[in-house]
Amino acid sequence: MDDSRETLGPNAFVTGFPIKHSRSPLIHGYWLKTLGLPGSYRAHEVAPDAFPDFIASLKDGSSDFIGGNVTIPHKELAFRLADKPDDLAHELGASNTLWLEDGLLHATNTDGRGFTANLDERHPGWDRHDTAVVFGAGGASRAIIQAVRDRGFREIHVVNRTVERARELADRFGPKVRAHPVGALAEVMHGAGLFVNTTSLGMDGEAAPLIDFAPLAADAVVTDIVYIPLNTPILRQAEEQGLSVVDGLGMLLHQAVPGFEKWFGERPVVDAALRALIVADMEVH
């Protein structure tokens, strides 16, 4: 995109600390170019102690941004500082998408929508069963549990090494969510139609524990929110055991859609060319 189009605005951001690793500028830049829209989307690193001032500059109009994405470690504070967080952000206690509207700073969390949209695209019918297993109870698991519950699953078994963390999630998300220690994994997998890894196991090619997926339903789907590498050890194990798998890259791509539409006025499409662009970037960085 040439500079003249960028200076016409609107301008959006992704902020975190650090932020240089973010692929969001590549995603949104692709959409701006393919849709022929004016504006820019750029990485803007903000240290934790400077984040309240950054939000204040959005609210008072002294920055040139109309909104943007928020990533680690600012998601919880972004939620607290927003004027109008929506119901999704309220339940999660975190937001990843901000926009100015009617003089107020609005906030939502699109991670769950990215998760379900990825599965809808890559494996339609993934939600035909009513039982899911979520492996891990860290911050990343919240949006997954929320999205799976809201899609209509009746039982969501959260399995974690520290069962107290899983119990906190069960308390937060209601009676459909049940907490279990790792030792109960095989038991709670019985007949489940969805298995989601929300841990960092296998990230950057690290080893992951061996998991016997045999207790899952024969047509179950195994997915991983880790997308580096695309084919994580957990996905490889599941595929070798004859199950359908969905990698986590699409979650990153689809979670970006609602924000882009808010800032730039058109709903973008996650297509094969965008996925190929990000995969190529992953191979060199």
UniProtKB/Swiss-Prot annotation:
| Pathway info | Metabolic intermediate biosynthesis; chorismate biosynthesis; chorismate from D-erythrose 4-phosphate and phosphoenolpyruvate: step 4/7
Give binding positions for NADP(+): 87, 136-140, 160-165, 225, 248
Keywords, sorted A to Z: Amino-acid biosynthesis, Aromatic amino acid biosynthesis, NADP, Oxidoreductase
Which cysteines pair up through disulfides? They are: none
What class does this enzyme belong to in the EC scheme?
oxidoreductase
Is NADP there in the keyword field?
Answer: yes
What terms describe the molecular function in GO for this protein? NADP binding; shikimate 3-dehydrogenase (NADP+) activity
Q: Which CDD domains match?
A: NAD_bind_Shikimate_DH
Q: Which InterPro entries match?
A: Aminoacid_DH-like_N_sf, NAD(P)-bd_dom_sf, SDH_C, Shikimate_DH, Shikimate_DH-bd_N, Shikimate_DH_fam, Shikm_DH/Glu-tRNA_Rdtase
Q: Return the GO cellular component terms, semicolon-separated.
A: cytosol
* Positions that bind shikimate: 22-24, 71, 96, 111, 227
EC identifiers of the protein:
1.1.1.25
Record's keyword annotation contains Oxidoreductase: yes
Where does the record place the catalytic residues?
Answer: 75 (proton acceptor)
Q: Which domain of life is it from?
A: Bacteria
GO BP annotations, alphabetical order: amino acid biosynthetic process; aromatic amino acid family biosynthetic process; chorismate biosynthetic process; shikimate metabolic process
- Could you list the residue ranges that cross the membrane? none
Q: Which NCBIfam families match?
A: aroE, PRK00258.1-4
- Please report which protein family the annotation says this sequence is part of: Belongs to the shikimate dehydrogenase family.
PANTHER family in UniProt: BIFUNCTIONAL 3-DEHYDROQUINATE DEHYDRATASE_SHIKIMATE DEHYDROGENASE, CHLOROPLASTIC (PTHR21089:SF1), SHIKIMATE DEHYDROGENASE (PTHR21089)
How is the subunit organization of this protein annotated in UniProt?
Answer: Homodimer.
Q: What is this protein called?
A: Shikimate dehydrogenase (NADP(+))
